[in-house]
């Protein structure tokens, strides 16, 4: 079968493409109305952007090429057609995804689901409740990925003359963002990098997200556990208004990681420390190219962006030590898998008010310390503002993404599969979806 003739894929800035399906490869999802027409769109976290984009294409290819999974391709059309099903995701950041979820366009074709890497705060849950969105909802983990600490230091060499890899730990990363560590040759950084010959006497250009970000949530979740000074000195709390509050906000038992832009919540502290302001960029896709183009810059991105832009990635100290010595790890499939196996997670998709715990700073000498889930929010009931076929199409895609889509064949470089038990619980939530009160996938 000629895929190019059967389905013509068009990916726009909003990651839009046409899908032609009557089921997924495993045959478990509902059959889609052959006359189904319309969009299936969501918004939110940029952490999973590369994976969602890749899934869209793979899903289309899988169902076009696998015998028996498509009854008749004649019923499906391209994304620029007036008929057919069109799947899209516009990004915008986790905060945008959450606010859109209970916004004016909720439960319509342009807002059928949202992505977030951050838990719903009590304020956000109260806003959803006050809005009365007209239905219950679920929050499921869609994909897992590590955060990479990325940097550019031109000409960094080992004492033997080879290209050097920077080592960092929670305290040094915290110090860099606080502004207590201003230069690359600071004694704290040098102590972690005895084999690096030429750490420069250059000011560190600290970069962070300018938008409300779930990636920042994962980052601050890590610092809250990994940096001994983070609880009271890193100031990562959404409600502080002064440097005093920032320095004294939370103890270890009540630490609350946030999505707030680093340039905002570190501003007073950095000024007090005589450090320059943090450079803010929107989205993982805004930070990665900036770091690539800027010598002496440092930031944090989902690891797929580090790969995509060929960025230098720091080796970060694991929680566990080997024979009393720190172990430094980079984000790989193996180190992420070790972290997920060791991490304790608290997940209850039937109760979205549950604080989902990001699997950061897991024990084990092989556990990469900055790993996070990216969650997907969807409504339990979709009204007549969308068609049954659109809801069927969304369920079919999500079921595929949580099953076949988690295999190495379909994972974009820099992402990892979620644990099987987690995916099984997520798929169970799809069976709760109704259209006008009627269960879509019994």
Q: Which sequence ranges carry the predicted segments?
A:
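Low-complexity, intrinsically disordered/propeptide-like segments
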Residues: 6, 18-20, 332, 343
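Flexible loop/hinge segments at secondary-structure junctions
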Residues: 26-442
